[in-house]
Amino acid sequence: MLLWTIQHKAAYDILLETGRLIANEKHLLFEGQFRPSYDWLVDQMKKRIGMPPNDVKYPVWAWYQWEGVRKRLDMRTHRYGGERGTPIVLLTIDVPDNMVLLSDFDMWHVILNDGYLPLYGKDDIEDPSEDEKLKSWENVFCVDIETDWWDALKSTQATFWELKKEWVLKAEHFVLAG
């Protein structure tokens, strides 16, 4: 599956040196309220694509498509979100399909905010139970459907347990703009 991931240059150097890249927990950006959402995603990955390697707790993230388009990311837009001048690398990668879990980027934010996630407006529940809410979160994996509730151009993210050096097709170097 053709994907694109943006990594810090230091992470890319680790990939080149060791032959693989895994998420380093000390660099993750989800302390506090977001951790339960990420832990839920990890559980879903285990169910849907299999167990991670023993040394892996959290996934590597990439893009499958951005705003409805399957193509290389436009780095004029995607080089923000960190300290200005930080070296980053846009990797074009080909990960085996059975090792990737796709999810809807916009819907993911409902999960991050601990909300109920209906696919259709008619399915919205005013005060869902915890079980109803958690079950609704599985809608984040419905990346191929169009609904009246989610009509924006789809941005689809990909998660997988590790990135192997041999999956890298192209590496392009950039600097964060701020």
Regions found by a protein language model. Name each.
Residues 18-50:
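Membrane-interacting alpha-helical segments
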Residues 38-71:
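Short, well-structured hydrophobic secondary-structure segments
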Residues 1-2, 9-31, 56-58, 67-178:
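Conserved NAD+-utilizing ADP-ribose enzyme module
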